[in-house]
């Protein structure tokens, strides 16, 4: 029986910043990355990478990276644990779906993210207004 790999793609690379405004001044204004969404309530903003749907996520609260897209964060966390890794932070709800933090047997942290609730919907100013899908 053929199975597909657990990690589907890099969904986002998170970059800790002291505050969103200074992070946006650098990554958006100085480096030219397009603002895709901004969620002040959770202290994050997503920026585009040309030719890719992987995002740069500026964050004031989270320091794990990269974020790996998986079909189910719950199933993926169990699979990593069965394979000899460990769960650092059990699966929990996030605005767009579910997220778990695991470590491989070598101590590398992996953020496992599913988009079971959809992606962010934004207004003309790129502020998050809800979810799509």
Region roles according to the model:
Residues 13, 23, 27, 76, ...:
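Hydrophobic pocket/interface hotspot
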Residues 1-24, 53, 64-66, 116-133:
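N-terminal beta-strand motif that seeds the catalytic metal site of vicinal oxygen chelate
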Residues 34-64, 109-115:
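Conserved short beta-strand elements that form part of the metal-binding/catalytic scaffold
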Residues 29-36, 84-86:
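Conserved acetyl-CoA-binding loop of GNAT-fold acetyltransferases
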Residues 12-14, 46, 57, 65-67, ...:
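Short aromatic/hydrophobic contact patches that present stacked aromatics
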Residues 41-42, 93-95, 121:
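Conserved beta-strand edge residues that scaffold enzyme active sites
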Residues 19-20, 67-109:
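Vicinal oxygen chelate
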């Amino acid at each position: 029986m053929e199975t597909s790999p657990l990690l589907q793609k890099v969904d986002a690379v998170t970059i800790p910043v002291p505050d969103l405004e200074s992070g946006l001044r650098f990554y958006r204004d100085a480096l030219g990355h397009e603002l895709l969404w901004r969620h002040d309530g959770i202290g994050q903003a997503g920026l585009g990478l040309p030719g890719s749907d992987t995002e740069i996520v500026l964050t004031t609260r989270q320091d794990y990276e990269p974020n790996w897209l998986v079909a189910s964060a719950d199933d993926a966390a169990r699979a990593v644990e069965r394979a000899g890794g460990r769960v650092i932070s059990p699966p929990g709800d996030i605005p767009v779906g579910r997220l778990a933090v695991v470590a491989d047997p070598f101590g590398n942290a992996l953020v496992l993210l599913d988009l079971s609730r959809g992606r962010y919907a934004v207004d003309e100013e790129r502020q998050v207004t809800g979810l799509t899908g």
